[in-house]
Amino acid sequence: PDIYSIGVQGGTMHRLTTSPAGEALPSWSPDGKWIYFSSNRTGKYGIWKVPASGGEAVPVHAEGSNSAASPDGRFIYFIKVLPETALWRIPSQGGKDELVLKNVANGWSFSLRRNGIYFAGKADAGEFAPIRFLSFETGKIRTIFTLERTVGYGLDVSPDEKVLLYTQLDQAGSDLMVIDDFR
């Protein structure tokens, strides 16, 4: 798939990427000038950006997916899944990546705010995922609550930080069935 934009009132769609590679998970830069996205143009998923007005896409980081710019625009946060799912960041202008969080439940369950990061943490054996908050000011992580089921794909926090949205897997297993005489 490619990345497209369209005005919220409708109108003409604008194709922003044209690569035969898989491209997904677009997000805006805070100033609205760039669109960050995941692409496997090089054979593995990495972070790329393209001007919001159109133009050539350029690589930001060789590996990772599900990127989001910090509210101040200084960093791009993203998920690396190997050897384990973790949240990383890189300066927006380029540079060395830095590990932010090791214990992220999956690549779609974090939400950046000016004062920190809300995220679904990895659950201990026999438990479900805790929703946690990493404070940028103190560097400390606190548990907000623990889900009663397995965390799904997606987590966000309202602008006033009073309501949290998340998905959960109500059935995380499989059923085994035998069907006789199915012909």
Give the residues covered by each predicted segment.
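Beta-propeller blade-edge and WD-like acidic-aromatic loop motif
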Residues: 1-15, 33-34, 38-59, 74-75, ...
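Residue-level signal for well-ordered alpha-helical segments
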Residues: 5, 24, 37, 46, ...
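Short coil/turn segments at the loop-to-beta-strand junctions that recur within blades
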Residues: 19-24, 62-67, 103-108, 147-152
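Blade-terminus and WD-like Trp-Asp/Gly-His loop motifs, strongest in beta-propeller folds
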Residues: 26-34, 67-75, 108-116, 155-163
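Intrinsic disorder/low-complexity signature
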Residues: 37, 63, 69, 100-103, ...
